[in-house]
């Protein structure tokens, strides 16, 4: 079913909102960013299947879309960002059998690990983290609607989507239905067409299940995202993000389900980030237009062939954060334009660390001259508030031009690699100003040279915070204070997950969290005003 596009007649952005352009995977072009209901923006990112600890590849999408939300908010939009958690899946069931513990317990543990790692990388803009198991009524209703409209069919307790009923199937990925023929697991022989995919899977002995009109079972992977995005963002929303490897079959199937169910496009802008590749040396950072064009043309197979994954031994993210710091990893991920492949090895990560140190040295130098901390500077939090008149001041004239160049880079499909290169231009300009005016500790705070320096540096604070960088002094790797802060954060995440489990009467999971923490030397204290924790002696 191909529906009329409700996005065809939308209001132009107000004069306060800039001319941002976004690369849309569906159209294969950069398009003006015109939200459906400006200034409100709905954004959905496919999150993890929480069956094992996170690795660095899982952080690529969240860091990118956290930055995109920051920039859209800075540009005057009101963004609602959703990241789903897949907590029922074949991999989770397999891990449950392997470890001999409930699937829900594994999901709680690994969700806490994922969220703790996001926090360390400064990903704090997520508004909703829906879990599939909390949305079974919505998922079942969604499947029922597809069946009643003739887009799905049930056979022996399994429900499949009929891809032949959607003439638009394959437009997102340029794939044919024949490419989908492996989907369906052990029930694949029941399908009417090789390309049909599972919406509901009948229960097998020893596996978790939910009651449904088709009997006991559990949802397929693709339907979870369609149901949860619809529940929170509505029938059609602005941005759907995810890794390039999810374009097919996952996003293609999501799009088919939602479009057919609602008779309207699911998403206006499909955005796909490049994947992370390990073990190669190569250039990272702001790329030329030619390099970016080549990255756009790279196929899914080319990027996925070297993709970092658990199966290839990736892991140890908590240890990596401990040794490198979350800010260094975030900086490393943002140095590359988001649609490009990120080359990950010791050399490229070390290069990012060296680059970051140049900023830290400047912040120390600034503090020595002015007596002020860079991290305490007052800076504009909205684009419309950050403009200024250089009034003939040489330094401010340069910084004003640099700010415009930074904004142009971000307006051009959120090119963080180019934006970071512009910040390096600013750094060189500021250091030249200090050297030319021989500024040092004890300089007169009211001198024109120092006043210009403070104003110019506040602009750098404004722009870097848009990228989620330099909001607070750098953490030292392995420091006791950082460890204590991380421990408190993780325990409170588990306390909240335990509370939610008990509220839905999943007492086994709640007790498992308490007991596992006790094994690790953490005692939970339940009181009328809430739950706190302490180390066991």
Curated annotation (Swiss-Prot):
Keywords associated with the record: Aminoacyl-tRNA synthetase, ATP-binding, Cytoplasm, Ligase, Metal-binding, Nucleotide-binding, Protein biosynthesis, Zinc
Enzyme class: ligase
Residue window of motif 'HIGH' region: 48-58
Cofactors (names): Zn(2+)
Listed EC numbers: 6.1.1.16
Amino-acid positions noted as binding Zn(2+) in the UniProt annotation, renumbered to this chain: 46, 225, 250, 254
Region entry Disordered, spans: 171-194
Keyword Zinc: yes
One protein family per Pfam: CysS_C
Entry GO MF terms: ATP binding; cysteine-tRNA ligase activity; zinc ion binding
Manner of cofactor binding, per the entry note: Binds 1 zinc ion per subunit.
GO annotation terms (biological process): cysteinyl-tRNA aminoacylation
GO cellular component: a single term: cytosol
Top-rank lineage group of the source organism: Bacteria
Reactions this protein catalyses: tRNA(Cys) + L-cysteine + ATP = L-cysteinyl-tRNA(Cys) + AMP + diphosphate
Assembly, per entry: Monomer.
Similarity comment text for this entry: Belongs to the class-I aminoacyl-tRNA synthetase family.
Protein's UniProt name: Cysteine--tRNA ligase
Name of the gene this protein is made from: cysS
């Amino acid at each position: 079913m191909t529906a009329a596009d409700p996005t065809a007649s939308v209001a132009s952005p107000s004069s306060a909102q800039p001319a941002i352009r976004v690369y849309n995977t569906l159209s294969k072009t950069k398009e003006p960013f015109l939200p459906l209901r400006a200034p409100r923006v709905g954004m959905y990112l496919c999150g993890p299947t929480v069956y094992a600890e996170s690795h660095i590849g899982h952080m690529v999408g969240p860091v990118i879309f956290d930055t995109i939300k920051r920039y859209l908010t800075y540009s005057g939009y009101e963004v609602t960002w959703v990241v789903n958690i897949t907590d029922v899946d074949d991999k989770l069931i397999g891990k449950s059998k392997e470890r001999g513990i409930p699937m829900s317990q594994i999901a709680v543990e690994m969700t806490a690990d994922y969220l703790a790692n996001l926090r360390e990388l400064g990903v704090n803009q997520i508004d909703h983290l829906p879990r599939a198991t909390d949305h079974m009524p919505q998922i079942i209703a969604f499947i029922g609607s597809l069946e009643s409209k003739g887009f799905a069919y049930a056979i022996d307790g399994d429900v499949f989507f009929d891809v032949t009923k959607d003439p638009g199937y394959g437009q997102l990925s340029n794939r044919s239905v024949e490419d989908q023929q492996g989907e369906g697991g052990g029930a694949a022989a029941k399908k009417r067409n090789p390309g049909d995919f599972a919406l509901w899977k009948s229960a097998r002995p020893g596996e978790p299940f939910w009651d449904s009109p088709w009997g006991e079972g559990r949802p397929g992977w693709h339907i979870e995202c369609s149901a949860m995005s619809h529940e929170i963002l509505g029938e059609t929303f602005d941005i759907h993000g995810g890794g390039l490897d999810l374009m097919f079959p996952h996003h293609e199937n999501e799009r088919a389900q939602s479009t057919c169910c609602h008779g309207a496009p699911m998403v206006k802008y499909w955005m796909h980030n490049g994947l992370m590749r390990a073990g190669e040396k190569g250039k990272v950072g702001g790329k030329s237009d030619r390099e970016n064009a080549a990255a756009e043309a790279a196929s899914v197979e080319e990027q996925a062939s070297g993709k970092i994954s658990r199966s290839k031994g990736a892991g140890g993210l908590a240890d990596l954060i401990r040794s490198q710091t979350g800010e260094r990893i975030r900086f490393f991920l943002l140095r590359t334009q988001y649609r490009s492949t990120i080359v990950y090895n010791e050399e490229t990560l070390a290069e990012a660390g060296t680059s970051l140190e140049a900023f830290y040295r400047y912040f120390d130098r600034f503090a020595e001259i002015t007596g002020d901390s860079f991290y305490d500077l007052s800076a504009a939090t909205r684009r419309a508030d950050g403009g200024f008149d250089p009034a003939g001041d040489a330094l401010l004239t340069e910084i004003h031009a640099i700010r415009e160049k930074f904004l142009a880079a971000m307006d051009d499909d959120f090119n963080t690699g180019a934006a970071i290169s512009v910040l390096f231009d600013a750094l060189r300009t500021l250091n030249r100003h200090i050297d030319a005016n021989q500024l040092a500790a004890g300089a007169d705070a009211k001198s024109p040279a120092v006043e210009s320096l403070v104003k110019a540096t506040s602009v750098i604070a404004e722009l870097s915070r848009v990228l989620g960088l330099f909001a607070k002094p750098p953490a030292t790797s392995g420091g006791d204070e950082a460890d204590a802060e991380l421990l408190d954060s993780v325990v409170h995440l588990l306390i909240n997950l335990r509370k939610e489990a008990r509220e839905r009467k999943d007492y086994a999971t709640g007790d498992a969290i308490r007991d596992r923490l006790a094994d690790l030397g953490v005692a939970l204290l339940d009181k009328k005003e809430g739950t706190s924790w302490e180390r066991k002696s």
